[in-house]
């Protein structure tokens, strides 16, 4: 495969993963508020995959979706969300909250999708309440 084709495949898999995550969130009672939001127009890195309202907890949820073909025995959960990505997510979420004048409760979740389009039922792992300020380079879960 050529590098350009690999990029297209990666983009398609990412879009598929986001669609799977949206479906998952809706089935679990979340209302989708925004998708692929770029609250800072001048900075393409600042993107929020999904913004959803959790009716059960009355809080806004900023969701980062990570799609993998299959689980790796060598990778820990959340490993693909590195320090730079966490920093960009924090900035994007703060910008979204300012732009939408959101003053209520909020949290950050990561949804990991294991599977590929047409490859059967994907495995979905939702990690809630992820802290974007890592301690010693590692993620910390609040709950």
Describe these PLM feature segments.
Residues 1-23:
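Interdomain/boundary linker segments immediately adjacent to catalytic/signaling cores
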Residues 14, 18, 44, 81-85:
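Short, conserved glycine- and acidic-residue-centered signature motifs
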Residues 26-43:
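A short acidic/basic microdomain associated with nuclease active sites
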Residues 29, 46-49, 106:
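Short beta-strand or tight-loop elements
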Residues 46, 59-61, 109, 125:
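Protein kinase-like catalytic core scaffold
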Residues 48-72, 89:
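Conserved catalytic cores of phosphodiester-cleaving nucleases, focusing on short active-site segments
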Residues 67-117:
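Catalytic cores of nucleic-acid endonucleases
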Residues 99-143:
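Domain-level recognition of nuclease-like catalytic cores that cleave nucleotide substrates
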């Amino acid at each position: 495969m050529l590098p350009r084709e690999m990029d297209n495949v990666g983009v398609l898999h990412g879009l598929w993963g986001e669609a799977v995550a949206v479906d998952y969130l809706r089935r679990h009672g979340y209302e989708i508020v925004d998708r692929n939001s770029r609250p800072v127009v001048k900075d393409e890195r600042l993107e929020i995959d999904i913004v959803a309202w959790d009716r059960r907890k009355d809080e806004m949820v900023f969701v980062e979706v990570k799609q993998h073909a299959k689980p790796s025995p060598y990778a820990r959960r959340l490993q693909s969300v590195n320090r730079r990505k966490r920093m960009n997510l924090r900035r994007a979420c703060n910008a979204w909250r300012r732009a939408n004048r959101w003053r209520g409760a909020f949290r950050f979740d990561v949804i990991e999708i294991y599977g590929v389009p047409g490859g059967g039922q994907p495995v979905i792992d939702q990690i809630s309440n992820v802290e974007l300020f890592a301690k010693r380079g590692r993620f910390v879960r609040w709950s």
